[in-house]
Amino acid sequence: MCRPGSRSWLVAAVVGLLVLAAAGGVSAEPKLRVVVTAPFDASGLEREDQWMGEGVAQILSLGVAQHPSIVQIERGRLRSAAGTDTLTEPVLTQAARAVRADAAFFGRIERRGTDLAVVPQLMELKQSGPEVTSLEPIVAPSAELFGRLATLPVTYVRTLHVSTTDAEAARIEKAARPTRVPRAFELFSRGQISAFRGDQEGNEAAVDLLSRAVEVDPSFVVAAYMLGVVHSSLGNRWKAAAQFRAATQLDPQYPEPYKALGDLYLSQPRRLFDQAVEAYSKAIELRPFYADAYVGLGDAKAAKSDIDGAIAAYQKALVYNPVNPRVHMSLGKIYYGEKGLYYEAVNAYKKAIDLDPRSVDARMGLGEVYEEKGLYKEATEEYRRVIEIDSKHTGAMYNLALVYEKVDPKAAIAQWERYIELASPLATEKDWVDVARQHLRKLKNQVKD
């Protein structure tokens, strides 16, 4: 039997049930626009000023997050789809299509005499091909530039012909001006660049830069929140929680740190589910269209066995963000695990993979279905793909060894040895390593005989 996935089956089942319920005709009005935001090309600037390209992207992301009709694709998915950090227009077009965006925000920054010019562009991905619109450049002295960019997110939204009230525009502009201290914003942007690297060194550099941003501007709530996010990525739960709480005190109306606290509570060994529900609910109170907070709320209620409450939360999450591949992955789990519906499960997993080809959870689920149905060739392909994406994915290495036992004992021996070498130093893999060694001894004896 293959190893069970690391995600809670109950949560996955609830999400699947939600999608079944939602399939009856939930429609999102007004129409949602799915967008990606790329760092602006600042390669023509001096090296010490090239952080500004990320700075513009941050302003856009912070601003449009305030609009209920804009769904933003995470930067990590965009980078994975692109396969590079250099997002030229052709690369951006291909990557945006891959993540199912229908628009992309991008552009460049150039020097014009003593001023800087931000030259924004909008790409709409239509069936006939990409259509690029050039927006009015914003030209200003360096010290004044980022203060003038607060109107840019609204310009993008209205160029997309998305209805925007005066109150929404004011909320967007306020969010797009997260600090009035230029040096603090520079440190914040540099910190984001480091954090996007996703490795230990990058996160540690981000902690230093974001800490300095908060020192320069103690009221910079977004920097305080992001410092907590990076601490969480480094496994520093207590420091992360302290930063999130500090952010809620700096600005009690800012929902992101409440959602982040919910994530921390939900993942605590002490099972702080009630506190998670409270934190997610507060985030939703502050931003009623906060899709990720609804997902967290659904997870927390499912963990409390409040199935009806979980379904209602997931329903809201789908209304505000219907392009989440996790939905289809969860459908695959419930189709096969609960109902034994093989074809429906395979189709659901394939849909999740179509939306996010690098989803190791969906590929693991599909591989497990194939394996249990005796389709060892197909299972092998999925587990190998997971290992290509994440060479240290112990679950895929373990399951691949099990499949090889059915078809090629010698290959299984080699795979078990690779798994044991990788997993032995990991405390979380101890029991699995013990089982693997038993399999390995048995196989070696069989091959001898």
Give residue ranges: language-model regions.
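C-terminal/domain-edge helix-coil "capping" segments
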Residues: 28-33, 95, 126-212, 216-219
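Position-specific recognition of the canonical hydrophobic site in helix A of tetratricopeptide repeat
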Residues: 195, 232, 259, 266-268, ...
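Structural signature of tandem alpha-helical TPR/SEL1-like repeats
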Residues: 201-208, 233-246, 267-282, 303-316, ...
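Terminal, low-structured helical/coil segments at or just beyond the last alpha-helical repeat
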Residues: 406, 410-449
